[in-house]
Curated annotation (Swiss-Prot):
Family membership: Belongs to the LCL3 family.
Subcellular location field: Mitochondrion; Membrane
Lineage of the organism: Eukaryota, Fungi, Dikarya, Ascomycota, Saccharomycotina
Organism field: Debaryomyces hansenii (strain ATCC 36239 / CBS 767 / BCRC 21394 / JCM 1990 / NBRC 0083 / IGC 2968) (Yeast)
Protein name: Probable endonuclease LCL3
Predominant place of localization: mitochondrion
Gene that produces this protein: LCL3
Amino acid sequence: MPPIPSEPENISLIHPKVLLLSAGVTTSLFLSYKFYKRYVRRIRNYLDLTPEILDRQTPLYGRVTRVGDGDNFRFYHTPGGILFGWGWLRHVPTKRQELKDETLMVRLCGVDAPERAHWGKPAQPYSEEALAWLKNYIFGRNVVVTPYSIDQYKRLVGRAQVWKWTGKKDISAEMLRNGLGVVYEGKIGAEFGDNESWYRKLEARAKWLRRGLWSLGSSMTTPGEFKKVHYRGDS
């Protein structure tokens, strides 16, 4: 005679097995969401930068899509890089209309480049050289940005690094090393990370070697002084 099937076990919602399974599913969903937020979700523009990202200084990986000035650039966030398909499954847009509202404006920390001509104001010596150098150094390249803050112009102020044959390079440091900027002089919104002392040593060496704008000697004006005269009406 075939065995008589047993009655199905009635398990209540508070049974240890149910509670254990629920806890496991909940934990998995929570960890998946945290992983998505930190490593997968793309930061489209400054509105997506949460206080948590800035407080933790979460590194952001991406591509430089435009260089418009000597100390800032447009950055398209590519979370996870090549491991998450960027460059072979997912591609960075190149057309302006595709990039609209999809990039971060990054302001290099710790450095101030010579001012270009704006709104009828004159250009500062070495402003075009600084812009040309920065374009050649990072345009179209992948960089990593350590975010520090958002300034009054909705720019992300942070440390940007780019990979070269000789290793990872701090872009602010390289500008100072080549005399294409000075250590940032502003009192409001100044960000250096832990590198202010290093930046000042690089600036001092460039000045001693008369590199870039330091070759102007006594006629050299810092970007901060230049802006006071030409942009704030001070004489």
